[in-house]
């Protein structure tokens, strides 16, 4: 075997490697561990293994009973199928056997791509930096110093050669493992840097500031967090090169994020095929000023529902109908949606609903907005708001009883002795209930209902406890329990209705009619209850809910007609339960309105088709001598002489779809768009009407879920433009840029 030329280190100069083996470019120095060449050959701490050759410590290798010095230079031009051809010399591979006991550990830490181990006298090893040649302690005998200090030398730019900013490196710390690891027989590829997006990227001050602004927006952090000492110290420990910014700078970054996301949303709105409905929420402040938030809801080309906040505007008089109308008009102009508005949903007090409706219709009509069917559907009241309002009315009617029950539960929960005594009495009286007594959260009426419901089962226990414990004197009277029973009876209707709405995976407008008509029917019957206590409670609820029903039953009914499982049949059935002999009159109102609405959509469709035909008339003119021209005239005459049936009539006359559990109404309309091209446009807009202000998946029981909300003092102190940027950008950042993609089985998260 010819002796290769020598050098200080083992170098392989490779031009080509065939059969899946690794190519090493240029004069790449192989001086560290964990490098496999040709799938068999490995250089590890000056030990070379060929094939399955035996490893020998030091710088020698036993190869077919010959000792070969490793510190030699081998020029390799070609490697074919594992056999080697040496440039100028002949190198013959010989199959060897390797005792498994002689296998050594491979080093896995990425720092070894920057350091070389040097053997020192006395069995000491030191790690030498490949760039600055500075050495560091590594091992002394069996004691190993680890790699943390080596990693700091590179990552913190302690190396003099890394002082130049262009040469600074960032090690992928997530991949750092223990210094040593067990070796394995399989082929291991040479480690190279692979960018994962940030680990090896150069530091970018502007990008970091933008991400910091997004963090502040998404998590409601104050702008002055950038000047807080703890925050600056934390950031400095993560990235010393980050230049600390002030409040004005981060505020500018927030506005930049807002503008970029607004442009993305503008693009989304330009692709919306139908109309857009708005929700309007009032925000109060500790000052005399107020804010209103506007959110747009729509269905996209793929029949998926979306809601996006569009404005958070300061108004001088938020409860003024003129201020609301002006703000809405300004928003529509800013977003180029003046011709796309369909409905507006409010959570205002019902007593002012008519005033708001009339003012908005008149104001926006004067602005020549295209309002459908003379504004009959234009202003919608929030269903969640009416549920909360009615529930609070019921709770207020039994406020004194609730106080006694709360105090009773506090007494029982005050000590384990009281709890044991209460449980003992319940056992003696053989109370079958397994409910647990617990205090309510006063701002969430559902917890009050559940508290009353549990206490109702233990009314005898409370009475017995009062007779045997002189310290307890809060037991409600028999009449009080009667009031609680009546309150729970009717609160259960509201509770179940709210749960049904929240449980809907896709709360389109059609599902609200089912809940509303059942409540209206139950309360209408309850006001004639023979028990005066039940009758009194029902009357309180009916007065409030009946006003909502009169204001919104038309839009609710039209929405359910767009459900192919019910159509007009459910309207006819429910109205017969509510209005009895006068049902036909109210059914006709719905029927007339839905035909009028369809007629407007059909007229708009014909106008668009006429314009399209005019623009393309030259392209469709038949050539001279068309033998089927007379046939076309014949078909036209037949069509005009025979009465045609509209898409709406065809839809209503067809059989109802089965009421299956997982019926997807939006998917059904998507599949039937070709069959009902005009009616599907109408269905798209109607089903997108936001009947509730509460986000999908959120609780509607909280007092803050509906009605006016309070803006905290900090945000009230900010400039109105900054407040709007913070609120809107937080909503927009939840979604991918310039897209309306969302799961088709659930309504996307709405503005909270």
Swiss-Prot record:
Residues 647-733 are annotated as: HATC (Hobo-Ac-Tam3) domain. Its main location: nucleus. Zn(2+) binds at residues 129, 132, 153, 159. GO terms for cellular component: nucleus. It is found in: Nucleus. The keyword Signal does not apply. A zinc finger (BED-type) spans 106-166. PROSITE patterns: ZF_BED. InterPro entries: hAT-like_transposase_RNase-H, HATC_C_dom, RNaseH-like_sf, Znf_BED, ZnF_BED_domain_contain, Znf_C2H2_sf. The keyword DNA-binding applies. One of its GO terms (molecular function) is DNA binding. GO terms for biological process: post-embryonic development. Keywords: DNA-binding, Metal-binding, Nucleus, Transcription, Transcription regulation, Zinc, Zinc-finger. Transposase-like protein that is essential for plant growth and development. May regulate global gene expression by recruiting other cellular factors. Homodimer. This is Zinc finger BED domain-containing protein RICESLEEPER 3. It comes from Oryza sativa subsp. japonica (Rice).
